[in-house]
Amino acid sequence: MTQFITHKWLAALGLASSIAAFPALAAKDVVVAVGSNFTTLDPYDANDTLSQAVAKSFYQGLFGLDKDMKVKNVLAEGYTVSDDGLTYTITLRRGVKFQDGADFNAAAVKANLDRASNPDNHLKRYNLYKNIAKTEVVDPATVKITLKQPFSAFINILAHPATAMISPQALEKYGKDIGFHPVGTGPYQLETWNQTDFVKVKKFAGYWQQGLPKLDSITWRPVTDNNTRAAMLQTGEAQFAFPIPYEQAALLAKNKNLELVASPSIMQRYISMNVTQKPFDNPKVREALNYAINRQALVKVAFAGYATPATGVVPPSIAYAQSYQPWPYDPAKARELLKEAGYPDGFSTTLWSSHNHSTAQKVLQFTQQQLAQIGIKARITAMDAGQRAAEVEGKGQKESGVRMFYTGWSASTGEADWALSPLFASQNWPPTQFNTAFYSNKQVDSDLAAALKTNDPQEKTRLYKEAQDIIWKESPWIPLVVEKLVSAHSKNLTGFWIMPDTGFSFDDADLK
């Protein structure tokens, strides 16, 4: 519990004059303005990246992802995998303490993974861990995890921000309320959570990495209004803000006290086409639509330059991603292909969007105008979350009204399986997952399944390349852009940046 002692009481104790004789060091307190509120401080029960990002203040995993989305050791020192791909033996870092004084060890790992893989706990991230058969303690610094079936991307699952190590003592003490009482091994510990206003964390004196953290506190403050978030940087009320609205970026860039940063992301924006429905069952129609979109112009019109044209169906930062020559803008070629497909005068269709914010509206309007130039009349609908859940995610192929669908995907494991399987595997048509193209190819299914059964990087590369080659050629999507992430911070704040999955990195953050 934080104790506050007033200046009056210090004076009464005869201490005020001696304290005043020494200049006080300025506290290194940072305020971060973010775009939405937090749902929980339990990473296993959070579906939103922001809640998991804030939870990194308190929590760490066995592994993590660096700024290039490559796996790195955190609380683990290394691992081995059995020849059959079923057993992972992980060596743990010694001498690490939780913020409540409990030891971090193999028993703590078992407690967390047993909880995460138990369907009776109804945790939102259960699907990440449902392949775990059992977790065993070999010795205090070694844990053995056995899977139900081989899954070669498993270490990426352990590197996912959801896979945090929570103090077993805290789990026992707080139970289902652990989301309000985070206790981890991270650099900061919870000071205050005002659920309508902010989360404040303070330096954890017992942190295992010497010399860290350098900040005294971080206050995470949700500010949903774009203009207010930007204004807080201008006035010094905040030292870091994300996301920065595109229309505010130029203004903030002119402020000599601020630095505007556009960083790479793994957020791919695309339009899927329902290949089970006419006219999108015709490959020439799908090719025509890809030629019809001027992606360079789209980057300027809808994203103010803060995006790059897509060069594949998997963003370049993701492991095993393949890049291709981007589709050129060629409306004449598009009209020729439509004619060959039997649609010389074009056709009418619908274009839905998974979001209704201003950027999505701009993409819809731009695409509608581009399609009109080749004779396609698209009726556009920007959906809210409820509509999307009911009309897109909740309906199977026979009852689905999806034809063209603008959306996005971020593979936060950093590995190709989560970028491909939910979106292209035959078994993942809605309502199972998010294959809104209702795409199906036996070779792609076979390649994706085989890639999870091998730990040979060369074989995985071959399989993922073959799958992506087929998907790119068959064009169930109109790949549009990969977004850039726009943030801004005070120039005296260093080591604080945005990860490609829109999480935050602040391990080495300092206020000069």
From Swiss-Prot:
Give the GO terms filed under biological process for this record.
Answer: dipeptide transport
Name the Gene Ontology molecular function terms of this record.
peptide transmembrane transporter activity
Main subcellular location of this protein, as a coarse class: periplasm
Q: Which Pfam families match?
A: SBP_bac_5
Q: Name one GO cellular component term.
A: ATP-binding cassette (ABC) transporter complex
Question: Which keywords fit this entry according to its UniProt record?
Answer: Periplasm, Signal, Transport
State where the protein is found: Periplasm
CDD domains, A to Z: PBP2_Ylib_like (cd08499)
Q: Does the keyword Lyase apply?
A: no
Q: Which Gene3D superfamilies does this UniProt record tie to the protein? A: Dipeptide-binding Protein, Domain 1, Dipeptide-binding Protein, Domain 3, Periplasmic binding protein-like II
Give the range the annotation lists for the signal sequence. Answer: 1-26
- Recorded family membership: Belongs to the bacterial solute-binding protein 5 family.
Give the protein's biological function. Part of the ABC transporter complex GsiABCD involved in glutathione import. Binds glutathione.
Instruction: Cite the PANTHER family for this sequence.
Output: GLUTATHIONE-BINDING PROTEIN GSIB (PTHR30290:SF32), PERIPLASMIC BINDING COMPONENT OF ABC TRANSPORTER (PTHR30290)
Quaternary structure and interacting proteins, as annotated? The complex is composed of two ATP-binding proteins (GsiA), two transmembrane proteins (GsiC and GsiD) and a solute-binding protein (GsiB).
Task: Please identify the protein, giving its name as recorded.
Answer: Glutathione-binding protein GsiB
Instruction: Tell me what gene encodes this.
Output: gsiB
